[in-house]
Structure formats: structure tokens, C-alpha cells
Regions:
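P-loop/Walker A NTP-binding region and its immediately flanking N-terminal helices
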Residues: 1-177
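Extended, largely alpha-helical regulatory/partner-binding modules appended to the mid-to-C-terminal parts
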Residues: 89-93, 111, 124, 160, ...
């Protein structure tokens, strides 16, 4: 019997609608208003730390622009038309995704410029998503500038960056900037709890707090930690599991260690995981 391969949580629960973008309420509200008022710019710049949803947001924008079955008065992509499905998978012929970290030169950008004159093959807009755009060379930015100044009507650019200060002001002045923030701890914990519920699992509150602290507001990092913990978990995630995975000491063990130090006792009295974490 064929068994479907395991899909990591970050991919399994990647947002498919704007309403699923966790902790980015201001961003979602602004994007909704721009679509509803038909004031969608030709270039977006998504700025935020790693793992907060920049790539997911870029694909949502691409889907909203090219969805063929959106309901009247709604900005949410249908996720059922061929455009939505292929964009979600990163396979749409008219949505070109490029890694600015590996393609930094002027020739890479010139390849894009040479193709913008051609209309989309199967969608309304041809969309270029450039991740880590701050890694482009100065000559590459200069080559891109002319197209951003006078873009074809059928072309949209979506840039993503973790380092806004490295992007030239001439580029920043020609894009609509959106800032994605790191998630508040309570919001992230609630999100993790919901995912565990859908997976038929549960977790100690302290375990989720530990994951949230380690992830520091990054959804992707939190789900990556959760994936690793689930390898050794049957039904309920305990904080001890998380601490052992991360090589950390729990609060109770920290207090116990302080007591041992005060009393001048040997480390032989503490657990092996704790001893490994502090030595």
C-alpha cells in the first residue's frame, strides 16, 4: 500500500489565504484594502526577519493577482483554479521565483528585463518574485531601476528582504513596502497549539513556551523545532523533551543547580541531560 511521504509542518501548514497569515494583521489589512480599492502597485517589497512569512505572502499576492475564480468583493484566492494551485506549489510558468543570494549579477537581472516585454502565457500578470533582493549587486540594481520606473502593465515585482538598509534608496522609492514582524510569544504559542490539535497531539504549556522562546518570533523556526520533537513523541510533548533537544536546562533544574552550588555539592546529583547542557 502506498504511503504518502511525510511533509514538514512548515510546508503542510503554509498559509493558503491572507486570513491564515498569523500575527500579520496590519499587513493583511493593508493588502486587502489595496486589492479592494484596485490600488495595487507594480512592485512590492516584503521586509522582515527570516521565517516570518515573506515567501508565503509573496505567493499569496501572486495568487490574488492571478486567481480566475475569486468571489466578487473578496481578495482571497480560491485555491482551486489552476493558477492558484500551481503558484502555491511554486510551479507556475508566469510566476518566476529567483534567489537573489545566488543570482546577484547584472546579467541575471538582464535576463529578467529581456522577458518582461512578453505577456503572461496563462495568467493576467507575469510576476517576478526575488528573494533576498538585498544581495543583488549595485549594477544589478541599476539595471532593474529602469524597468521599475516604467513597468509594463502586465508585470508585477515582489521583492523580499531581511536587510532593508542594503537596498538602494532609488529602489525603495519605487516600491510599496510592507513590514512583517516577528510573532508575539502568545500568538505563536496559540498557533502551535492549533497545529498540534489538528495533528491529534498535545503539549505541556511550558514546552510550547520553550519552543516559542527559542524560535524568537519565527514561525518557520518554531515549526522546525516542533518537527524534531515530534520524532520522539507519541501523543504529548513534554518540556523535558524540548529541553533535551535544544540542550537547555529547565527552570526547576536551574534552581536545583543553584542550590547545589550554594551547598557546595557535586554535579553527580543532577540528571545526565542537565550535566551535558552545562558542561
Amino acid at each position: 500500500m502506498y504511503e504518502e511521504p511525510y511533509k514538514v509542518l512548515a510546508l503542510k501548514y503554509r498559509p493558503s489565504q491572507f486570513s491564515e497569515l498569523v500575527g500579520q494583521d496590519t499587513l493583511v489589512k493593508t493588502l486587502r484594502n489595496s486589492f479592494l480599492s484596485n490600488r495595487v502597485g507594480h512592485a512590492f517589497l516584503l521586509h522582515g526577519d527570516r521565517g516570518v512569512g515573506k515567501t508565503s505572502t509573496a505567493r499569496l499576492i501572486a495568487k490574488a493577482l492571478n486567481c480566475t475564480e475569486k468571489k466578487d468583493g473578496d481578495v482571497e484566492p480560491c485555491n482551486s483554479c489552476s493558477n492558484c494551485k500551481s503558484i502555491q506549489l511554486g510551479r507556475h510558468v508566469d510566476v518566476i521565483e529567483m534567489d537573489g543570494a545566488s543570482k546577484t549579477g547584472v546579467n541575471d537581472i538582464r535576463e529578467i528585463i529581456e522577458t518582461v516585454v512578453y505577456r503572461a502565457a496563462s495568467a493576467k500578470f507575469k510576476i517576478y518574485i526575488i528573494d533576498e533582493v538585498h544581495m543583488l549587486s549595485n549594477s544589478a540594481f541599476n539595471a532593474l531601476l529602469k524597468t521599475l520606473e516604467e513597468p509594463p502593465e502586465h508585470v508585477k515585482f515582489i521583492f523580499a528582504t531581511t536587510e532593508i538598509k542594503k537596498i538602494p534608496l532609488t529602489i525603495l522609492s519605487r516600491v510599496n513596502r510592507f513590514d512583517l514582524k516577528r510573532l508575539d510569544s502568545n500568538v505563536l504559542i496559540s498557533h502551535l497549539s492549533e497545529i498540534l490539535k489538528r495533528e491529534g497531539l498535545s503539549a505541556e504549556e511550558e514546552a510550547l513556551q520553550t519552543i516559542s522562546r527559542e524560535a524568537a518570533g519565527s514561525v518557520r523556526d518554531a515549526l522546525s523545532i516542533l518537527d524534531q520533537v515530534l520524532v520522539n513523541c507519541e501523543t504529548k510533548i513534554e518540556n523535558q523533551m524540548v529541553n533535551e533537544l535544544l540542550g537547555k536546562i529547565s527552570k526547576s533544574e536551574t534552581l536545583y543547580l543553584i542550590e547545589l552550588i550554594i551547598e557546595g555539592l557535586s554535579l553527580i546529583h543532577i540528571s545526565e541531560p542537565t550535566r551535558r547542557a552545562i558542561i
